[in-house]
Amino acid sequence: MVLLDPLANALSTIKNAEAIGKSSCIVRPASKNIGNVLKVMQDLGYIGDFEFIDDGKAGIYSVTLVGRINKCGAIKPRYSVGTGSFERWEKQFLPAKNFGALILTTSSGVMSQYEARDKKIGGQLLAYVY
């Protein structure tokens, strides 16, 4: 079976494990993009530590959950966001202002919308988490 969107699959795995109360989960296949999104989620405090494990194939991530995720998911299609249009997308994907975060990819790497707003750069939306 071919995965069409590994990022969406990874976030769905994390959301489902969080919903049933697990303390950790395994995300496969691993990629740099998924690792960067997990790093942003860790910096925001939504997940604990995560570790890359080489299984001889694509690799896997072992993610420690902390119980803070209500919902997370990938944003498809990957909408382009300018520096002044974050509020529009926050209203669409997040339940309230300053509750949760949008994760986007920019020319400076993967970051949250708060960091992108501070740096005054735009990018493409990857995911949301709250």
From Swiss-Prot:
Keyword terms of this UniProt record: Ribonucleoprotein, Ribosomal protein, RNA-binding, rRNA-binding
Name of the encoding gene: rps8
GO MF, one example: rRNA binding
GO cellular component terms given for this protein: ribonucleoprotein complex; ribosome
GO biological process: translation
Protein name: Small ribosomal subunit protein uS8
Transmembrane feature ranges: none
Listed PROSITE patterns: RIBOSOMAL_S8 (PS00053)
Organism annotation: Methanosarcina mazei (strain ATCC BAA-159 / DSM 3647 / Goe1 / Go1 / JCM 11833 / OCM 88) (Methanosarcina frisia)
PANTHER family (UniProt xref): 40S RIBOSOMAL PROTEIN S15A (PTHR11758)
Quaternary structure, from the entry: Part of the 30S ribosomal subunit.
Functional note: One of the primary rRNA binding proteins, it binds directly to 16S rRNA central domain where it helps coordinate assembly of the platform of the 30S subunit.
Family: Belongs to the universal ribosomal protein uS8 family.
